[in-house]
Amino acid sequence: MKAIGRVILSAILLVLTGLMIAFAKAAPSVVFSFYPALSRSILSAIASVSGLVPIALWEVLAVLLALWFFYTLIRVFTGRRSLLCWLSGVLLGLSTGVFLFVAIWGLGHFGPSVDQTLGLDVREYSKQELIAATAYYAAQANEYAEKVERDAENLTVYPAFSELAKQAPGGYAALAQQYDPFTDGLGPVKPLASWRLFSQTGTTGIFICFTAEACVNPDTYTAWIPFTMCHELAHRQAVTAEDDANFCAYLACMASEDDDFRYSGAFGAYIYCHNALSKVDKTAASQIWSTLSDGVIADIRAANEHYAQYEGKVQDAAQKVNDTYLKAFSEESGVQSYGEAADLLIAWYLKNNA
């Protein structure tokens, strides 16, 4: 295809992408009456292929794509390919990627949130409601902390990553019996082979819609691993917003039959609520902290120490990139949306403990 043809096709794809987003914003009741189910069906079809290999297929494809990129760039510098032809090819590749991303999964960013689909009353909460919810999740974390294996330093010890990865879909299978947004039959979570790179950027997990793979960094602190697995599986079910995925991770962990997952879910829920409470009432947050068991406190401190080693300019740059992406797809709080799961957790607490 000539350069002009690539440019024209790129323009068509970008226009179609814009039209999809515009229609989703203009008529959300129409689009999202079918899009979530369609997205899940497409992802399931893709996963039936990518799931045939135990490794993260997208990492292999990313390496091949990078090699192809540099190979074609070298051909430009050696005069075997024109710069215009190369640029038009890059433009077409990017346009195709954006179109497929939005069509397969990304359009969900403009759809209803989990609180709407589950009938939760998310609103502005009083400080007392936040305190009550934080105390509830702290007690829940204490309860399940006693049911998990611990080492000599009182830190959580979980089964191998591969075992947890197989168990992770179980919570969603249970939720699928009660709530429409969830489905069963999810494949296992995959470990990231390039985990060292992701640790440097502060990334604990990633979902790639092109291969429908939910992947988790095996370097994630132990107590967080089941929660993170369920977070990425939430994305696999067309849950796009980060705070929604965090809340779904909690629900899936608590719906699991495994206490390792239940502890991880309660652990994560407490931390999100504690962080929210600390911003408005440090005294109340400290009082609830004092009720935590030694095991929970040991895990929190160990997790903080683990992630502190990766803080730096690389992680800051990665956070800025992620922030830009989230804001581009209607998550106005950007990376802060990872903490807004507290709103959903409070709503869930109030609904079930009224």
Task: Show the residue positions of the predicted features.
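N-terminal membrane topogenic signal
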Residues: 1-12
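Membrane-embedded alpha-helical segments of integral membrane proteins
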Residues: 14-75
